[in-house]
């Protein structure tokens, strides 16, 4: 790598490219003279579009190819949507920077109805997420929930073509793509608890690359990192990938972390919820202890079914 060049591995979807350009612009603003190049690539999750993500299986569907590029020194950093980042990293790689979080809520998107509660019984709602599915089914068991894959533009096209009465997307993604006007309602965490890390952008690099880590330090957002640390610690203990019915959301209020989490049966028949409040320095331990509580209260059995019998210990 040339001293003044930094290469970013990124997926090629519009949202992934937005994230990569966001990081590129931040780096160039912080380090005048730095040349930042994008290295676009295709991941397994981008290719398999005809199967619900939960059935594709495997963790890291959207990041593995980017990590291989780092290990082979074809790129210096990989930029990820934090909700897609597995809890474990290949040896020698790690998450070193978490950028400031955008709105983490889920968005209700419809051309006909103003809110989730306004949908008539039997309406078809699209989502690819078991987490969204279980919360939707609990609140509105009279809806028909169908799988919805593809990038944001593809999903909106399917809604506009009449395949769905409404779809659920991330507020952050719509805002970043300039599509905020499509949001009919942002769903509060009480109705749809977000995914772990939702709305945050993370940066992965080789852990022994001191120069790159130094360049990235200016982009780290301390409050976001604390919140996402608590969320990810809980997910790690639950052995959760990005395609499981797990929600987790941490807020920093009056100097204290408030962490909420849930594990749900995909059909909404049972959702185990819990919460913790504590000091920011205890973020990781809070996540672990909340996960233990959920497991002991029934989450172990729910996850065993989702993981085909392979439950967290």
Curated annotation (Swiss-Prot):
Enzymatic reactions? 4 porphobilinogen + H2O = hydroxymethylbilane + 4 NH4(+)
GO biological process, any: protoporphyrinogen IX biosynthetic process
> What EC designation does it have?
2.5.1.61
Q: Name one GO molecular function term.
A: hydroxymethylbilane synthase activity
Pathway involvement of the protein, from the record: Porphyrin-containing compound metabolism; protoporphyrin-IX biosynthesis; coproporphyrinogen-III from 5-aminolevulinate: step 2/4
On this chain, the residues bearing S-(dipyrrolylmethanemethyl)cysteine are: 242
**Pfam families in UniProt:** Porphobil_deam, Porphobil_deamC
- Name recorded for this polypeptide: Porphobilinogen deaminase
